[in-house]
């Protein structure tokens, strides 16, 4: 899991920084000057070496952009100052994009931008990732490429990643059950107070990725792309809680065979391969897969009893078994009662 640390607590001698030194003359001096500033990092739990580093900086409308061509017009921006991820197959880049978007929301910026070289494979891979999530090439800052991402509330159903994390309240909304055994494994940011963060330290692709996979055999109704999912961790009258909001990116029914199904699910699903095979072989009626983007974890969890009191659920027997439709008003009730920051929702 990423940690937020002051520069002064990060080992500048780590080999991780060698390429940054090569690319930026004076990197060490800049780093030491930032002693009290904070950066986001992840560390390899086996050897203590750095795997990723991210430094963010807020900029006002009066910022001088004369060293960027064409010059950026005045806006409130979030600058992705230093961003490096070692490719280890665990989707750390996506994990850090989530941090970037969360900071952009919190600071109510108009735009995010990043300056990046395209000399190395890891940089080209990062550029490709940024482009997948809506960053577009703007111009140059010396030899560095500049990419910008508009951050005004907007939702493009045909390409949800390009307008992530914004979602419209006018979409259909479903409550979806998820068993306790799988809940925090798939949605680690929604960890319960009763669970130990130490159990979720290791890197797995399904934990880090914004894009995740939910395998289902539920009868209709089924959601469609752009619909909102509210995840409900099962556990009975007092212990069942709504924890998380996601948005449906894609539904897939038409797998050629078992291996096609496994390949599609592998990186975004909490299930190991043998469990996925078991699910496929269980019945002649094959499962379908909902690919969704994780949006937000509720700061305050409300349980089944409260959902019944609020008339979101009609009673104990109304607990979601498949995709349970709720109204937009009921979603607003959940957002209010969970004390959520709703700045990612377009009303």
For the regions a protein language model found, what residue spans apply to each?
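Short, conserved beta-turn/loop elements at beta-strand boundaries and strand-helix junctions
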Residues: 61, 249-257
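A short, internal acetyl-CoA/4′-phosphopantetheine-binding micro-motif in the GNAT/acyltransferase core
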Residues: 81-92, 118-119
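Contiguous surface segments at macromolecular interaction interfaces
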Residues: 103, 109, 115, 124-193, ...
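Conserved acyl-donor/pantetheine-binding loop and adjacent beta-alpha core of acyl/acetyltransferases
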Residues: 47-79
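Conserved acetyl-CoA-binding loop-helix of GNAT-fold acetyltransferases
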Residues: 90-105
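Short coil-to-beta transition motif at edge beta-strands of beta-rich domains
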Residues: 219-235
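Short amphipathic alpha-helix that is part of the acyltransferase structural core
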Residues: 1-43, 180-204
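Short beta-strand-centered aromatic/proline hotspots
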Residues: 240-252
